């Protein structure tokens, strides 16, 4: 286990900046998730930490040691890839042993580590099988086992669940979190899936355009997004972002004082109500456009007033609303998020 420090790290491809001066301190044993859309720089940053990409500027420290010029094998990290990266001609046991044999590890120590990893991941019965005989989830367990036997200072995960179906992703997500808590190994995990990020992370690092938009626990990022980008990216459905003039044109029944510079109001779908709450709130006049049942709850799409601005509510059950019905939607004042569209940042 070891802390990882990323200090003003930059990466340019020719004259094009991909990572624009990132600073991040990862504590010993912490599980950090880098999340953002394709092209935001998260995988590039991970590859620079791993030593698979050169660094244009700044430095990476693992366990207090500057590793900018160290080869990947010298950084004491283990990486789990999206495509498993298993040797198809070797058995599971052979895949687990391979790196240890290359480093000259004693036979007894190899056997101990392989058995321990197999027990942790419940792949003991598969040790004599080839990768082609395994399911996608089993192959990913073997890939994680290969990382575990190294007993590294840190794990790096590069979208390891992207190739799995939805059910397996949920299962493997739980297994990865349980594994990291058991081993207490410093981990950095890359994903574009914000649900995956929210459920795995001790802290999220939300990236956009080669920059860090926000760092915080999943609850902090969800409850208080620092920017319009984070507000629109974290959460499913994403936060409704309503221009202040549209908001004022359709609101009634309350007094709303917003911080200076606010020209955009953010409203979480699960914070909007169909009945007036006891807490201070604003009533919005709306017209029903679409109801999407998704099991025990529904997504209700409504248009505000007579304009074109639509918002989404998450409601329990399947309310019986006719299309184009006029309804009232209530927004609690203490759950509104004020933003400035020019700066893209919160105003409170």
Curated annotation (Swiss-Prot):
Reaction(s) catalysed (UniProt annotation): sn-glycerol 3-phosphate(out) + ATP + H2O = sn-glycerol 3-phosphate(in) + ADP + phosphate + H(+)
Gene: ugpC3
GO biological process: carbohydrate transport; glycerophosphodiester transmembrane transport
PROSITE patterns per UniProt: ABC_TRANSPORTER_1, ABC_TRANSPORTER_2, UGPC
EC number in record: 7.6.2.10
InterPro entries: AAA+_ATPase, ABC_transporter-like_ATP-bd, ABC_transporter-like_CS, ABC_transpr_MalK-like, ABC_transpr_MalK/UgpC-like, Mo/tungstate-bd_C_term_dom, NA-bd_OB-fold, P-loop_NTPase
Subcellular localization: Cell inner membrane
Chain ranges of the ABC transporter domain: 4-234
Principal EC category: translocase
Chain sites annotated for binding ATP: 36-43
Entry keyword Cell membrane: yes
Protein family: Belongs to the ABC transporter superfamily. sn-glycerol-3-phosphate importer (TC 3.A.1.1.3) family.
Membrane topology term: Peripheral membrane protein
Gene Ontology terms: cellular component: ATP-binding cassette (ABC) transporter complex, substrate-binding subunit-containing
Provenance organism: Rhizobium etli (strain ATCC 51251 / DSM 11541 / JCM 21823 / NBRC 15573 / CFN 42)
One Pfam family of this chain: ABC_tran
GO molecular function, one term: ATP binding
Name of the molecule in the record: sn-glycerol-3-phosphate import ATP-binding protein UgpC 3
Function noted in UniProt: Part of the ABC transporter complex UgpBAEC involved in sn-glycerol-3-phosphate (G3P) import. Responsible for energy coupling to the transport system.
Transcription found in the keyword field: no
Assembly with partners or alone: The complex is composed of two ATP-binding proteins (UgpC), two transmembrane proteins (UgpA and UgpE) and a solute-binding protein (UgpB).
Swiss-Prot/TrEMBL keywords: ATP-binding, Cell inner membrane, Cell membrane, Membrane, Nucleotide-binding, Plasmid, Sugar transport, Translocase, Transport
